[in-house]
Every structure is written in structure tokens, then in C-alpha cells.
Amino acid sequence: MDAIILCAGKGTRLHPITESRPKPMIPIAGKPILEHIIEKIENHVEKIYLVVGFEKEKIIEYFNENPKIEYILQEKQLGTGHAVLTAKNFIKDDFLVLNGDVIFEDSIDEILDYENAVALSKVDNPENFGVIELGYDNKVINLLEKPKKEELTSNFINAGIYKLQNSVFGILENLVPSERGEIELTDALKKLIEIGKLHGVELNGYWNDIGHPWDVLSANSHFLNKIISKISGKIENNVSITGNVIIEEGAVIKSNSVIEGPVIIKSGSIVGPLAYIRPNTILMENNFVGNSSEIKGSIIFENTKIPHLSYVGDSIIGANCNFGCNTITANLRFDNKPVIVNIKGKPVKSVRKLGAIIGDNVKSGIQVSFMPGVKIGSNSLIGANCLIDSDIEQESFVYKKDELVITKKRN
């Protein structure tokens, strides 16, 4: 049996983090979402076909040494069904299909027992997903895409993991494209439901559909809480390390710094002196966190510099960023209500604590503050003394004009 993992989409709801990388390559607890998925299935399959598109080179470069993996290019993203069809000539038997942005802990053993099956997750907000209704013997009897609350008949949702027979390719080829001109895998599932040939299998462990920035932070926190301490880097005098902490070889923790796990600090990173790294934080390769700076509950991508007297909380900071002294990310509203984030032009309630979401190659001057939930597009420059309270598009230059009054000193 082989597997198909769908990795071609642009992940626009996760901009600016996905402006320059595929969503499956976002790191969760130090490794890409896609690597987590592959680790769950690679012992069950002979070949893994990654359907790639946007920024495909970053996926290929990372996984190039895995002999089980082959790549299929989806030149135009015309739906999940179309993505599966691109693998038709490579699949000769039953196969798995997985969305490249779902992260889960449960074994897939049970789903393999059926000819056609979809994994299910039980959630509190099923109206935001494709809802699955089960009948006798775990047969799927209905699938509703993002129904209204009054239409809900189940708390089970489509978890984006499927085991299918080869014959599903024939169903996909005969589907009528949607109004958007796309061929959707869920439409093929509905055909299987009509003939009573689709079963549902509940996932009992952790599952997360990484669709929003706060989902990234939530998943990161969950998997960081599974790590086991391993200190391989250089630790200077008077450093306090508590909880489970991984410090890779080549990392340096300078004197009088405090690290509270779960935390991962990857190779080449320098922390301190007098820095404070709080729980649920990951510093990717070659980061710098300077004197008297504090990082809490955040993901800091590689080659980023957060210098002295700065605070980054509940934030995602892209690669190759360089902040000025006293950069602050606010992460909490006065009224303690969920932070509102602009997602594809619409205000969306996120979580109670959320800082800034900053793309790659962003530079800020001294004393820049970011209000909760703001997004800063890649390759932007933020001038000194700015308070950023709204989203900034990529390739922007933001600066503040203050009138400087100069007069002669009176005797």
C-alpha cells in the first residue's frame, strides 16, 4: 500500500508565515508538520507520494534523502480531488490520502481494516469543519460541509485522513467540478456514502487541523509537552534550567539566563546573558536572544535576532528577522476577550492570548510595539518608535514622522 500526502496549497489563512513556505513545512516542536505526518505512516506503506506545488523546492530539499518519498507536481491547484488524481498513474492498489496540514497522535491501524474509510475527530466546534454522521456498524451516512449550528447532527468531523480503494480514481474522474472549477475529494466521499461503502474511524488522540496561526502555537505547545530533556549545547555560569528542555549542540546559553521548559533551542542559537525563555517556546537554528529579553510561548524561525530589552509573547516570528532594542509584542486585551485577527479580510476570534504574526525578513527599529494579533508581511521595514495596531502588507516600509523642535537654550 502507498500513501498520498497533499502539500500543494498556498495556505493563505496562515499568511504571512506561508508567504514564503508551504504550510506543511511550518515547524511544530522543531520539525515540519509534514515530518510529523510521515513518521506516523511510513511503517505502513511502501511509497509516499507528496503532491507538491507552491514553494515545492523547500519540501523536496528537506525530504530528498528519504528513499520512500517521491514527488508529484500539481501545477494548478484545482482542488483536493484533482490533487489525488495527479497520483493515479503511480497507485496500483489501496492507498492512504492525508492532508498535509493535519497533525495527529493516534495510530492509523484501525483505518487500514476497511476498504474505504475516513478518520474522524470529535470537536466542540463542528460547524467549522466537514461534519460526519455515522450509522450502523460505523458506516458514514452523511457528510455536511461547515453546516449551520441548527443543522448539526454530530460532533464528528472529517479529520483529513483517508484509506481508499483504487477504484475511487474512476469516481474522481467523473465528478463535475465545483463552482470554483475545482474537483473535491469530499464529493467522491459522498458518492461512496451513497452506495454504503464508506466507514468512519474515530481518532482518540490529539488532532489539529493547522488552519490559523493560533493552531500552530497550540500544536507546538502540545508536542513540546512530550519532549524529554537533552542538554548538548554550551551552558555558562549561573544559568537556571527547569522542566524539560532540549538545547542542541552548537547552541550557547550565556550567564544568568533562565530557561523554563518545555523549550527547544536549536543549534547555532545564542541566548543571553540575562535572557528569560519561558515555556512552550522554540528557537530554531541560529537565533539570537539578547540581554534582558524575554520569549514566551512563541515560535522563532531560523536566523532571527531579538536583541536586548525585548519581549515576544505568544507570537510567531519568521526567518531572518532583525528587531531593534526594546521591541514588544503585546498579547492580551484589557477586557480578556479573544484577540481578533484579520483572516483573508474577515475579523476572526482567535484565543485569549495572541501576540504578533511576523513574516520572513522583517526588520524593526528601536522601541517598536506590536498590538495583539497583528500580522506583518514578509520583507517589511518598521521604523523606530512605531506602535503597530493593524496588519502590514508584505514589502512595506512603515515609519513615523515626529516633529522635532530645536530652539536656542535660554541662559
UniProtKB/Swiss-Prot annotation:
Keywords: Acyltransferase, Multifunctional enzyme, Nucleotidyltransferase, Repeat, Transferase. InterPro entries: Bifunctiontional_GlmU_arc-type, GlmU-like, Hexapep, NTP_transferase_dom, Nucleotide-diphossugar_trans, Trimer_LpxA-like_sf. Residues 205-224 are annotated as: Linker. Residues 1-204 are annotated as: Pyrophosphorylase. The keyword Nucleotidyltransferase applies. Pfam families: Hexapep, NTP_transferase. Coiled coil: none annotated. The active site is at residue 308. It catalyses: N-acetyl-alpha-D-glucosamine 1-phosphate + UTP + H(+) = UDP-N-acetyl-alpha-D-glucosamine + diphosphate; alpha-D-glucosamine 1-phosphate + acetyl-CoA = N-acetyl-alpha-D-glucosamine 1-phosphate + CoA + H(+). UTP binds at residues 6-9, 74, 79. Its EC number is 2.7.7.23, 2.3.1.157. Acetyl-CoA binds at residues 384, 401. The keyword rRNA-binding does not apply. N-acetyl-alpha-D-glucosamine 1-phosphate binds at residues 80, 130, 142, 158. It is an enzyme of class 2 (transferase). Pathway: Nucleotide-sugar biosynthesis; UDP-N-acetyl-alpha-D-glucosamine biosynthesis; N-acetyl-alpha-D-glucosamine 1-phosphate from alpha-D-glucosamine 6-phosphate (route II): step 2/2; Nucleotide-sugar biosynthesis; UDP-N-acetyl-alpha-D-glucosamine biosynthesis; UDP-N-acetyl-alpha-D-glucosamine from N-acetyl-alpha-D-glucosamine 1-phosphate: step 1/1. Residues 225-411 are annotated as: N-acetyltransferase. One of its GO terms (molecular function) is UDP-N-acetylglucosamine diphosphorylase activity. One of its GO terms (biological process) is UDP-N-acetylglucosamine biosynthetic process. It comes from the Archaea. In the N-terminal section; belongs to the N-acetylglucosamine-1-phosphate uridyltransferase family. NCBIfam families: Arch_glmU (TIGR03992). Catalyzes the last two sequential reactions in the de novo biosynthetic pathway for UDP-N-acetyl-glucosamine (UDP-GlcNAc). Responsible for the acetylation of GlcN-1-P to GlcNAc-1-P, and for the uridyl transfer from UTP to GlcNAc-1-P, to produce UDP-GlcNAc and pyrophosphate. This is Bifunctional protein GlmU. It comes from Methanococcus maripaludis (strain C5 / ATCC BAA-1333). The lineage of its organism: Archaea, Methanobacteriati, Methanobacteriota, Methanomada group, Methanococci.
